[in-house]
Amino acid sequence: MKVIEKVEAIKQQEITATENLEQMYSTIEEKNDDINAFVQLDIEKARKTAEDIDKRIKNNEETGKLAGLVIGIKSNINVEDFIISAASPTLKNYYGSYNATVINRILDEDGVIIGLTNMDEFAAGSSTETSMYGPTNNPKAPGHIPGGSSGGSAAAIAANMCDITLGSDTGGSIRNPASHCGVMGFKPTYGMVSRQGLLDLAMSLDQIGPFANDTTGIGLMLNVICGYDPYDTTTINKQPEDFLKDTTNSTLEGQTIGVVKEFMDITDDKITSQINKSIDDMTSLGAEIKELSFEDINLGLPTYYLINYVEFFSATRKYDGRKYGERIEEVCGAEVARRIEIGSYISQKEFSGKYYNKALQARSLIRNEFNELLNDVDVIAGPTVPKLPHKIGEEIETMDMYAYDVLTVLANITGIPASSMNSGLVDNIPVGLQLQAKPEDDHKILSTMSALENN
């Protein structure tokens, strides 16, 4: 049953919100000890919400777009009365005193928030191994990482623990785990979704987005969370369109799909072979394939990390142990410490022009060149991650870990929308097809996903 079909079934009283919740909770109880997707639950509060929805439906009262759907939230998004730790001992006792804008919008539409999902500490990672709660296990490839930093949110969907989850994406943190876990993940255009209430990693790169098992779940959640927010001045001040319409009767007839040569060249051969099958599927559905070249791909990771380091260093200065929590440098893990140290170095006045300003110049160059590529096509398609996920606990060099994001950081640098959906299996492990489009062309990506999903 697709997500939108479940909402209709709940509203038509074919199933109840309470039944849906209890089924999901039973799955969590059965699987979470092994998977560690959820790090915090409030089942009693969720039950009260579900019971209220059922009562209103029974009384023929109006209910919201998400009526009765079970929702999981990444642990760096403020939800009142939950511990918003960002999986770090720095904030292990910090209770959210307010709801992020996206949370209020979910609750206003009768979503049932069941709990918070695991993640890399402060979203600084690509494996969900750096969490103070321990690593998350990949439900689709047991023993392997689920990707990160939103690994718990992806794993929860892959294990059918909830209907939709939210994650945040700084350089691939939604798309990377969506690829490894074989689910759908969507990073909207920068500014399409409010970041108010997000404990951000890098403010100019971060974006909140959904995970689901089908495009109706993605479209439904985008309809709820997208839109202008006066509390976040980076949000786009225009009414977003109905994303659900892009999940029905979608076609690739007359569409031009770009394939970037360099994206394929740096990807493992087995993954490239599988991605080519998805591209062949697009051709059979009526799309024209156009080969593109992006020679500045090697600029992506260094540009991204220079910006990331400086913005992360700035964002973490408030965690000084004075108002709440611990001083971050005294309790954080190795990856967070590394980023703080490098960010501090780059931020020193005598170096700011040498590194950070150069990174901003490179960002403008990348944005301009990538947008030129997108002018000639509707969507760019290619692999989400260039290699398969490693095994949990396997020693891996820092730069090899960073390389997981080489194909995803470009969307954050440029602010464009991007998604990942399952392309197939390589060595019995899911690999994702990444789709990217021009800013505010989120609907083109969702329509392409739907055409592939339904055909």
Curated annotation (Swiss-Prot):
The active site is at 74 (charge relay system), 149 (charge relay system), 173 (acyl-ester intermediate). Its EC number is 6.3.5.7. The keyword Transcription does not apply. Keywords: ATP-binding, Ligase, Nucleotide-binding, Protein biosynthesis. This is Glutamyl-tRNA(Gln) amidotransferase subunit A. Belongs to the amidase family. GatA subfamily. PROSITE patterns: AMIDASES. Allows the formation of correctly charged Gln-tRNA(Gln) through the transamidation of misacylated Glu-tRNA(Gln) in organisms which lack glutaminyl-tRNA synthetase. The reaction takes place in the presence of glutamine and ATP through an activated gamma-phospho-Glu-tRNA(Gln). GO terms for biological process: translation. PANTHER family: GLUTAMYL-TRNA(GLN) AMIDOTRANSFERASE SUBUNIT A, MITOCHONDRIAL (PTHR11895:SF7), TRANSAMIDASE (PTHR11895). Heterotrimer of A, B and C subunits. GO terms for molecular function: ATP binding; glutaminyl-tRNA synthase (glutamine-hydrolyzing) activity. It catalyses: L-glutamyl-tRNA(Gln) + L-glutamine + ATP + H2O = L-glutaminyl-tRNA(Gln) + L-glutamate + ADP + phosphate + H(+). The lineage of its organism: Archaea, Methanobacteriati, Methanobacteriota, Methanomada group, Methanobacteria. GO terms for cellular component: glutamyl-tRNA(Gln) amidotransferase complex. Pfam families: Amidase (PF01425).
